[in-house]
């Protein structure tokens, strides 16, 4: 079972997706227009608090004592492919795919972008590292990750500040990783 609408309208669906989380129903929720940058539709169509509310369900345990919902907000086309893969493999809980409607640049890749995006299966991973000892860690999900790539470049060029950009597609999955991995990604 799957359903889709604008992310801002997920509020109307909250009782349904909360119950599907508690009942371990593997529903796929697809929400688009994920950011406040969708300004042409006016303030009624700008999701501000919705992602934070959704992330709380990742922290809520279902009756099996597991994360009750998998919430994924991919940063580019490669992460979206990985997110779909994760959604199809998740047969125990609902999955939320929170997608952008904006034209977003694909994130830079050292090797193959899809192979690098597979690291998203751990919830968060280092997308870009400027310098050996970053002074700043920039963390985002979804469409804001590309913005942080640009910000990291400016920090290095204009201020000489080395940074590390992290794509955090799922806070819940990231928190389940070993402490050593979490500290590697976010020292």
Question: Which stretches of residues belong to each language-model region?
Answer:
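Histidine-anchored nucleotide/phosphate-binding helix
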Residues: 13-20, 150-153
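Mobile "lid/hinge" segments at catalytic clefts and subdomain interfaces of large enzymes
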Residues: 21-28, 34, 58
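Acidic, glycine-rich active-site loops and adjacent beta-strand->loop/helix elements
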Residues: 5-12, 19, 31-37, 75-79, ...
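Thiamine diphosphate
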Residues: 37-51, 55-66, 70, 80, ...
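A short, small-residue-rich loop immediately preceding and capping a beta-strand
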Residues: 1-8, 27-30, 140
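Short, conserved loop/helix-junction motifs that constitute active-site signature segments
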Residues: 20-23, 185-187
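Short, basic, glycine/proline-bearing loop/turn elements
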Residues: 1-5, 66-71
């Amino acid at each position: 079972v799957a359903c889709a609408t604008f992310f801002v309208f997920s509020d109307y669906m909250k009782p349904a997706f909360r119950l599907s989380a508690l009942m371990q129903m593997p529903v796929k929720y697809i929400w688009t227009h994920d950011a406040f940058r969708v300004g042409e539709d006016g303030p009624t169509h700008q999701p501000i608090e919705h992602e934070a509310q959704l992330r709380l369900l990742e922290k809520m345990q279902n009756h099996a004592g597991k994360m009750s919902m998998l919430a994924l907000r991919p940063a580019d086309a490669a992460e979206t492919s990985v997110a779909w893969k994760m959604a199809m493999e998740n047969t125990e809980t609902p999955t939320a795919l929170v997608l952008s409607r904006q034209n977003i640049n694909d994130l830079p890749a050292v090797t193959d972008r899809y192979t690098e995006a597979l690291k998203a299966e751990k919830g968060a991973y280092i997308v870009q590292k400027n310098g050996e000892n970053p002074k700043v860690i920039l963390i985002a999900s979804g469409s804001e990750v590309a913005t942080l790539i640009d910000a990291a470049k400016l920090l290095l060029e204009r201020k000489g500040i080395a940074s590390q950009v992290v794509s955090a597609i799922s806070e819940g999955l990231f928190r389940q990783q070993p402490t050593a991995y979490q500290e590697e990604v976010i020292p």
